[in-house]
Amino acid sequence: MLCILILLLHPRLCPVTKGGLGKPSGDIYTALFGAPCDCKGGTQTNNYATPTYTQVTDCGDKNAYLTYDTNWNGVSSPKWLCVRKPPSIPVINGRPGPCPSECTNNIKSQMHSSCYSSFSQCTQGNNTYFTAILQRTKSTSETNPVTSGLQPHGVLQAGCDGTVGKSVCWNQQAPIHVSDGGGPQDAVRELYVQKQIELVIQSQFPKLSYHPLARSKPRGPDIDAQMLDILSATHQALNISNPSLAQNCWLCLNQGTSMPLAFPVNISSFNASQNNCTPSLPFRVQPMPSQVYPCFFKGAQNNSFDIPVGVANFVNCSSSSNHSEALCPGPGQAFVCGNNLAFTALPANWTGSCVLAALLPDIDIISGDDPVPIPTFDYIAGRQKRAVTLIPLLVGLGVSTAVATGTAGLGVAVQSYTKLSHQLINDVQALSSTINDLQDQLDSLAEVVLQNRRGLDLLTAEQGGICLALQERCCFYANKSGIVRDKIKNLQEDLEKRRKALADNLFLTGLNGLLPYLLPFLGPLFAIILFFSFAPWILRRVTALIRDQLNSLLGKPIQIHYHQLATRDLEYGRL
């Protein structure tokens, strides 16, 4: 027992041995394969292709790769192979520099983003292109094809054409219905579509110019009126579909930009002739995985007026209806097209494939009976505590519930409760001061109004007063400022009592505020003291009991009883 206590109290006395399955240190690699920048495996100068490697080290103008080769004997010893970095393209007068010599009269129309590690911009003639070092080749492929009586259509995945390790250049804008896998060409297409939609909106609704003094201020982090309307509508819909849940629930919004949910709907009720919708900029949504639904399709005209909205690849199109005119969705619906972008209206020159979907706000619903998750303190004094990850919000500020969060949770909860109480008192105090200031302004305004009323009555005295002159009912001012001031005074007195009660509470202010933090440790400390106090007495009592039992067993005399045995001679004598 004593050795265990010494080891627990003095952990530094024990030798520490580290082990694991991590990679070896750099010294071991240097001893086995040499310094990386020495390039013992050679320097690759004919191209800039990245070899197969396990580690890479930056050596300034080149990168050192720890490569390995495979042959019929197995894997050879790794070596550091150096590959020189491609020359960077400088920026001259705000424009990218000239393209590499390999790109002369060899500009590609498309390039998949998986075929290069990084890209930059270059200029050739009066045009700007993307350029990169080609790492692999790839052929063009088609995804999500639809053949429902119309011409097959889908999104084409761009290929990679060129020599591996050499520079390639390609256009900034890919051909229509060709995707580079989320690379720069897809980003340029999204910006182009957004700009074209802005032009359509400006042509229908001219932009108003405001005076700088009349320009509205940007909204802060508070919830605006539109979001409150969305929350109200969501609660009304929930009240209709699930009244029991709507009676007591939380409606939770995600932080940051909200992405609505998109559910594909049937187009049986769609009316292609309606054109009373208002276009807006496309916004990103979260399409829900769904089954087969009909799609809207319009082929490309192969001219500069086409607006490629992309191809909806999150749903399998059961059929495809061809439309050559502008389309408007129904109320509460939108067209979801490529890259999960939703359009409230499709212009006449759109091209691509879209799905009609209903939009719902991204709101999480938590029942009022369930606990609302809040963060917990997992690390106290450098040691990780066993704490409940999710605790109720309304009960988590109390003392009893905080015991479940660990030994340190009680002190933190009590201190947090104290700070919250002070904060609430200060907030209510500030609110009462604000109401008092508003009441002063109202009193001043009332005095001005009464003065104006008396002046108007004097001016219209010959006509019987202002009321007869206007042929209206006379209005009189009912001054209730005294009632408001009395309520504010009572509120301030109550706040002062609460502040004094918190200050006089020894449980919260004892030992200069350290008592709430010491209380969690007093229980275990008191238990340890009781254990070491009564353990010797209990040990003595048990030892004495065992000794008495042994003595009583060993002290008893051994009694031997003799009995006369019958012999066979006596039996024969009787005979």
Curated annotation (Swiss-Prot):
Renumbered to this chain, region (Immunosuppression) spans: 450-466
Entries under PANTHER family matching the protein: ENDOGENOUS RETROVIRUS GROUP S71 MEMBER 1 ENV POLYPROTEIN, VIRAL ENVELOPE PROTEIN
Under the subunit heading, UniProt states: The mature envelope protein (Env) consists of a trimer of SU-TM heterodimers attached by a labile interchain disulfide bond.
As given in the record, the signal peptide range reads 1-19
Question: Which cystines does this chain contain?
Answer: C249-C252, C249-C475, C467-C474
User: What is the protein's given name?
Assistant: Envelope glycoprotein
Pfam families from the UniProt entry: TLV_coat
Q: How is it modified after translation?
A: Specific enzymatic cleavages in vivo yield mature proteins. Envelope glycoproteins are synthesized as an inactive precursor that is N-glycosylated and processed likely by host cell furin or by a furin-like protease in the Golgi to yield the mature SU and TM proteins. The cleavage site between SU and TM requires the minimal sequence [KR]-X-[KR]-R. The CXXC motif is highly conserved across a broad range of retroviral envelope proteins. It is thought to participate in the formation of a labile disulfide bond possibly with the CX6CC motif present in the transmembrane protein. Isomerization of the intersubunit disulfide bond to an SU intrachain disulfide bond is thought to occur upon receptor recognition in order to allow membrane fusion.
The record places the motif (YXXL motif) at 562-565
Residues annotated as glycosylated are: N126, N239, N266, N271, N302, N316, N322, N349, N479
| Example of a GO biological process term | fusion of virus membrane with host plasma membrane
- Transmembrane parts of this sequence: 518-538
